[in-house]
Amino acid sequence: MEPINDSYTVVSRKPSLTPSGWFGNSKDMIVELENFMTPEEVEFLEKAAKSLTIWDVTQSHVNENGTVVYDSDYWKDRVASNPSLDKNDPAISPVIAGLFQRLKPIVEEFYKVEVVPTGTTIVKWMPGQFQKPHADNELHEGPDAGTPNDFPHYNISRLFYLNDDYEGGELYFPLQGVQFKPKKGAAYFFPGDRNFIHGVTEIKSGLRFTCPFFWEITKHTGERQP
């Protein structure tokens, strides 16, 4: 990595071993597991999320072409990954990690892969915030379309939803024509490439809390190989 000023760092990322578009573009690749979390897990994590006071401090990144691949200002004071979670309450991360392990065999069987998860994270969404359609592991438009973003190993995206006492904040997939308000306690997963760009509609009121994390594919186990 090469610093270019006080605000941005140039980064170069290696592509994933899984080609973009490997999983096609069917809406059937977007999976909902309703009531995946137990009532006790939901209650604990919702309360923990609403009590967070320590958030990550990060730096924005650009690629070799000067395109922003991670904007730290957008996420300021609303993302708590593992180190920040531990400073808030060391009991939080083990509960989320337990969800990872329970979901792992389901994801591996569905996509015919072996995966490892990224770290534990809770994200807060406040009124007025939204997210434009994006892919999780690559850039999807302009001259950099198809090149890695800051997270090329985010092959499969996964979200746990911790609350539903807010308005707006729907998850949508414009290429598949899918839009819905995620259900409290549910798990969702889908491919991270540009065939599954997705966004979040504006939060109108209340606070929206999610546990996003991602799976890196380390091996393809099906007959079809990249």
Segments from the language model and where they lie:
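Glycine-rich, acidic and aromatic/proline-enriched surface loops and short helix-turn segments
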Residues: S51, P127-G128, Y161-D165, D193-R194
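Catalytic core of Fe(II)/2-oxoglutarate
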Residues: D144-G146, D150, Y154, D165-P226
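Non-heme Fe(II)/2-oxoglutarate
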Residues: E2-F110, T121
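Short, well-structured beta-strand
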Residues: Y154-F160
